[in-house]
């Protein structure tokens, strides 16, 4: 009898390694699938481990460029910070992982997909909603959520089935990383009063250890896309990874956040996103230079909504598609170069230039070269202030009594 095929989102860690054996015992033929989205995974090791543990096939996919160009770029152009702080690190990679899982499932003729998420996090929602959007006929299985084992029970199960137990299990933190940043939770971070220890960080240095000399970087954008760093053209993925190193050594991009999860609880998260913070800061300044006022004032409304829909796992929803369409329509003239000073945790814009700049020095100056028609201000003020004046004239005739 042919076994039912299931594609597992495989990380190489304890949870998903145990999940392979658990799914095999449940009657499935397991196909493992692992993506590198910029966290620097050893894909060859992970591919071999999946087979050793019990998978019948193992896919490893270098998805850094696709992640950068189709997912991180949207977050950059949307200046996406969930609740004004979280730059959607993990939330951005989940729809891409789900997309690849569905592609492998179709290729293998699988009828189900499995993930290693717990029952109290956001990722279970992101994976399952994305999979249902892309392949509503596929069943989704969540071993970790179903078995409800403690960490000790999981380790014992692994030992009983000769599953290699990772040597870093004593690490108190739960970490997720991609090229857009690094997320950290659990351990001492669960107490919101506790200062995050330096051991919680990897991409950035503390302000105390940051250099006393700044780095100056120039980032060039073409239609809202970063295309070069300090005059050197590079792919978006490489530009982000390079900027992570440069900005990270100055302590840029540390975020400590009490976050409202989709599942209804608050969690304390520590993030590192040096490139994301630097790029969003630079991109925002270039938009300020090239946007007309009405677009500049309206776009933040769209930015907030995009941040929420992505965080909530609705990447493939009609709403997100429409929001992204608006976003892309605004980027045509976002061309130019931004000069940023990286120093002691700050990304400070010190210069900007653009062939599409709407800044006219002759209109803005107060020198003799001023070309602004100040006489036009009289009529403008009269018309602009007319509703306020009429309201005051009408309502001043009404006696207002205020009771104390």
UniProtKB/Swiss-Prot annotation:
Compartment list: Cytoplasm
List positions binding L-citrulline: 86, 122, 126, 174, 183, 259, 271
Task: Provide the Gene Ontology terms for cellular component.
Answer: cytoplasm
Question: Catalytic activity, per the record?
Answer: L-citrulline + L-aspartate + ATP = 2-(N(omega)-L-arginino)succinate + AMP + diphosphate + H(+)
Pfam families the UniProt entry points to: Arginosuc_syn_C, Arginosuc_synth
Question: Do you know which InterPro entries this protein is assigned to?
Answer: Arginosuc_syn_C (IPR048268), Arginosuc_syn_N (IPR048267), Arginosuc_synth (IPR001518), Arginosuc_synth_CS (IPR018223), Arginosuc_synth_type_1_subfam (IPR023434), AS_cat/multimer_dom_body (IPR024074), Rossmann-like_a/b/a_fold (IPR014729)
Q: What is its EC number?
A: 6.3.4.5
What is the first-listed, main subcellular location in coarse terms? cytoplasm
Q: Which PANTHER family match?
A: ARGININOSUCCINATE SYNTHASE
Q: Which family does it belong to?
A: Belongs to the argininosuccinate synthase family. Type 1 subfamily.
Q: How does it assemble?
A: Homotetramer.
Q: Could you identify this protein by its name?
A: Argininosuccinate synthase
Quick one: which gene encodes this?
argG
């Amino acid at each position: 009898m042919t076994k039912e095929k299931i594609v597992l989102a495989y990380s190489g860690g304890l949870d998903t390694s145990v999940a392979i054996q658990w799914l095999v015992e449940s009657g499935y033929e397991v196909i493992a699938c692992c993506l590198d989205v910029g966290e620097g995974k050893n894909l060859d090791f992970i591919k071999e481990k999946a087979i050793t543990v019990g998978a019948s096939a193992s896919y490893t996919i270098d998805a850094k460029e696709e992640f950068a160009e189709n997912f991180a770029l949207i977050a950059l152009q949307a200046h996406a910070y969930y609740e004004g702080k979280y730059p959607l690190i993990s939330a951005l990679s989940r729809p891409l992982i789900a997309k690849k899982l569905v592609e492998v499932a179709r290729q293998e003729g699988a009828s189900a997909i499995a993930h290693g998420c717990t029952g109290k996090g956001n990722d279970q929602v992101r994976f399952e909603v994305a999979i249902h959007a892309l392949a509503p006929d596929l069943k989704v299985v969540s071993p970790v959520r179903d078995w409800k084992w403690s960490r000790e029970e999981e380790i014992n199960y692994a030992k009983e089935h000769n599953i290699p137990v990772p040597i870093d299990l004593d690490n108190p933190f739960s970490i997720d990383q991609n090229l857009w940043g690094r997320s950290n939770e659990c351990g001492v971070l669960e107490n919101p009063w506790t200062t995050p220890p330096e051991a919680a960080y990897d991409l950035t240095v503390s302000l105390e250890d940051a250099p006393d000399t700044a780095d100056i970087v120039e980032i060039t954008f073409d239609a809202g896309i970063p295309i070069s760093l300090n005059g050197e053209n590079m792919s978006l993925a490489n530009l982000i990874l390079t900027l992570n190193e440069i900005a990270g050594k100055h302590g840029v991009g540390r975020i400590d956040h009490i976050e409202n999860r989709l599942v209804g609880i608050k969690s304390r998260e520590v993030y590192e996103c040096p490139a994301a913070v630097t790029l969003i800061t630079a991109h925002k300044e270039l938009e300020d230079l090239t946007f007309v006022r009405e677009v500049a004032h309206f776009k933040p409304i769209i930015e907030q909504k995009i941040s929420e829909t992505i965080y909530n796992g609705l990447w493939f929803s009609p709403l997100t598609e429409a929001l992204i369409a608006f976003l892309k329509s605004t980027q045509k003239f976002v061309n130019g170069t931004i000069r940023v000073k990286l120093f002691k945790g700050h990304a400070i814009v010190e210069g900007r230039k653009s062939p599409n700049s709407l800044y006219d020095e002759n209109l803005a100056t107060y020198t003799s070269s001023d070309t602004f028609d100040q006489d036009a201000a009289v009529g403008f003020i009269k018309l602009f202030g007319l509703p306020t004046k009429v309201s005051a004239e009408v309502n001043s005739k009404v006696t207002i009594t205020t009771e104390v």
